[in-house]
Amino acid sequence: MRLETIRQSMRATGAKDCHIDRVLRAWTQAKPLESGARRHQPENFLPQALRTALPALQEELSALARVRSEHPGEDGSSRLLVELADGQTVESVLLPRDGLCISTQIGCAVGCTFCMTGRDGLLRQVSSAEMVAQVVLGRGRRKVTRVVFMGMGEPSHNMDNVLEAIDTLGTYGGIGHKNLVFSTVGDRRVFDRLPQQRVVPALALSLHSTRAELRAELLPKAPHIDPTELVELAEHYARTTGYPIQYQWTLIDGINDSIEEMDGIVRLLTGKYAIMNLIPYNATATLDYRRPSLEHITTLTKYLHAKGIRTTVRNSAGQDVDGGCGQLRARTLDAGTATDAQKISLKHLKTGTRSAA
């Protein structure tokens, strides 16, 4: 269901925009309808026809997304397995410090080799209403002031729904525009469309390598944009919006954790309005990748800091509860052990010298 469909159903009752806005504001903020009203009963500010239709509408909204299971993590996060109305499931993650990560697709077409979400390809799009419903579920559990579109799926492949959800959360949900984060592997449409929106979100860009050939192997179906050009496009967005770009880099042992790669980061990001988020890989039994040692992660972080690159280390939230993207859903679906054809080999992914000397 699209959010515009919800508006149209209320408009069909004769409701005016001010009435529709009131209902959307209450829903997206997970508050009672009378919350904040000068006159506290709905009959004082909503027309009779809309009040009559509200119970059925509220039931329909509640059915958009339900929590099938909740898995608190030791880091203060809580991973939610969310069941949609058709029985499909997605993951949402309540993050420390009032954040929420939501999913935009069931499956993913990009096929990042280190990610569980895309192993079966794209199953279907998540609608704008289903995205907002994930936020409503999260707000029913704790305070949410920041939403990142960084869960299952590639937001640029579901652009209309994602932008509609962002507009609704920024307009009615009480979330600051810079606290709505659009995450992407890099798609030219992102840089064209996002700055034109009423609600302009911050941008997170999945980089993972500064070498075009390695990045193409790690992200086989991402748009083929050279990392240098990608960073230039992102820098223009950062300067236009005033929001720093959050670069994401999944650190994989022996693949993209060499000092040569760090020098590539320095080359691309020096002088840029940017934050580099190093995300140590969250190991799974079905993918042949490893997480670098804590000592090596610390060495890389210090190296980038010394070169003037603002860097953070962000572990996947809820690592003790299948914290990597798509892992909880995969476990729930009882995927089992990967076949030889499914198991990813590292031999063809060549990396540079790893020494920090």
Curated annotation (Swiss-Prot):
Keywords: 4Fe-4S, Cytoplasm, Disulfide bond, Iron, Iron-sulfur, Metal-binding, Methyltransferase, S-adenosyl-L-methionine, Transferase
SS bond list: C101-C325
Domain Radical SAM core: start-end pairs: 94-320
Keyword presence, Iron-sulfur: yes
Keyword Disulfide bond in annotation: yes
Protein name: Probable RNA methyltransferase Daro_1157
Major location category of this protein: cytoplasm
Single GO MF annotation: RNA methyltransferase activity
